[in-house]
């Protein structure tokens, strides 16, 4: 009485069409075919992006934590979009000045915010072409411009 999937010798078309229609319920498939990574994400589908620092800000972490997470507001060079990026490690905000060029990378899970920092989807990797980690470990100095 129409229970289960067709299993006959001539059922390939039916199975194929059924699978094709139902794949649209899968998030990754839909995202890939519609190209939403290129349309909606600020990076335009790439893993990193350069930008200019507009301002420094402290964002309060979500409950139950209590902290002020150090972030910067950045305008991307490639498309002019403004994003908020987290500055990792203790005291690294001192290496970042306004109007500096920074390299941003993703931060968190599949384009969503990470941990207790609301609405922050990116982190700072380089400042003025120098790795933020190298500056923090005092292995390199920021170039004077």
UniProtKB/Swiss-Prot annotation:
Q: Where in the cell is it found?
A: Cytoplasm
Q: Which PROSITE patterns match?
A: RIBOSOMAL_S12
Q: Post-translational modification, briefly? A: Hydroxylation at Pro-64 affects translation termination efficiency. The stereochemistry of the 3,4-dihydroxyproline has not yet been determined.
> Is this entry keyworded Zinc?
no
Could you state one GO biological process linked to this protein? Answer: regulation of translational fidelity
Residues bearing PTM 3,4-dihydroxyproline: 64
Recorded hits in Gene3D superfamilies, A to Z, give: Nucleic acid-binding proteins
Q: What is its main location?
A: cytoplasm
**Keyword annotations:** Cytoplasm, Hydroxylation, Isopeptide bond, Ribonucleoprotein, Ribosomal protein, Ubl conjugation
Entry GO CC: cytosol; cytosolic small ribosomal subunit; ribosome
Instruction: Give the family this protein belongs to, as stated in its UniProt record.
Output: Belongs to the universal ribosomal protein uS12 family.
The entry's function note states: Component of the ribosome, a large ribonucleoprotein complex responsible for the synthesis of proteins in the cell. The small ribosomal subunit (SSU) binds messenger RNAs (mRNAs) and translates the encoded message by selecting cognate aminoacyl-transfer RNA (tRNA) molecules. The large subunit (LSU) contains the ribosomal catalytic site termed the peptidyl transferase center (PTC), which catalyzes the formation of peptide bonds, thereby polymerizing the amino acids delivered by tRNAs into a polypeptide chain.
Write down what this protein is called.
Small ribosomal subunit protein uS12A
Organism the protein comes from: Saccharomyces cerevisiae (strain ATCC 204508 / S288c)
Q: What is the lineage of its organism?
A: Eukaryota, Fungi, Dikarya, Ascomycota, Saccharomycotina
């Amino acid at each position: 009485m129409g229970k289960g999937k067709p299993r006959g010798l001539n059922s390939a078309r039916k199975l194929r069409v059924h699978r094709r229609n139902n794949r649209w319920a899968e998030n990754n498939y839909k995202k890939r075919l519609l190209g939403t990574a290129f349309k909606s994400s600020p990076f335009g589908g790439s893993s990193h992006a350069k930008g200019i620092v507009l301002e420094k800000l402290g964002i309060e972490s979500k409950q139950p934590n209590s902290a002020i997470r150090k972030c910067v507001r950045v305008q991307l060079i490639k498309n002019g979009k403004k994003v908020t990026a987290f500055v990792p490690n203790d005291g690294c905000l001192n290496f970042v000045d306004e109007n500096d060029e920074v390299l941003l990378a993703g931060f968190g899970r599949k384009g969503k915010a990470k941990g207790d920092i609301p609405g922050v989807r990116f982190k700072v990797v380089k400042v003025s072409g120098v790795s933020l980690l190298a500056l923090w470990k005092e292995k390199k100095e920021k170039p004077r411009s």
